[in-house]
Amino acid sequence: MSTNEASYRDKKVMSIGIVKELTGLSERQIRYYEKRSLLFPDRTNTGIRKYSFSDVERLMDIADRIEEGVQTSEIRTELAKKDEARKMKEVKNQMLQGQLNAHFKRKL
């Protein structure tokens, strides 16, 4: 995934109403998942929640796991592990990119 794709997916621009339409979840469910620390929307100065496309995907995953009977505490643990793995992958990719840049600069 390119940096532009990542920033596009993670940009928090959608209101809870749009997220509700995209996911089929109620506003109450979305707020509940936030309260259970499964989701972390940004807030505007006036307190309006803003969500990203990544948040929508995360909500769909949460809803699927809930439907499978998984407890929110277990989902939180799973999501934390996924988030950590994603961060580690990003760091690794940045390190590799830095090594490639350094290698090609030496060749010039």
UniProtKB/Swiss-Prot annotation:
DNA-binding region: 16-35
One GO biological process term: nitrogen catabolite activation of transcription
Domain HTH merR-type: residue ranges: 13-81
Induction: Under conditions of nitrogen excess, repressed by GlnR. Under conditions of nitrogen-limited growth, it positively regulates its own expression.
Stated regulation of activity: Under conditions of nitrogen excess, the DNA-binding activity is inhibited by the formation of a stable complex with feedback-inhibited GlnA.
Assembly and oligomerization: Homodimer. Under conditions of nitrogen excess, TnrA forms a stable complex with feedback-inhibited GlnA.
Note: The amino acid sequences of the N-terminal DNA binding domains of TnrA and GlnR are highly similar, and both proteins bind to DNA sequences with a common consensus sequence. In contrast, the C-terminal signal transduction domains of TnrA and GlnR have no homology.
Name this polypeptide is given: HTH-type transcriptional regulator TnrA
Source species: Priestia megaterium (strain WSH-002)
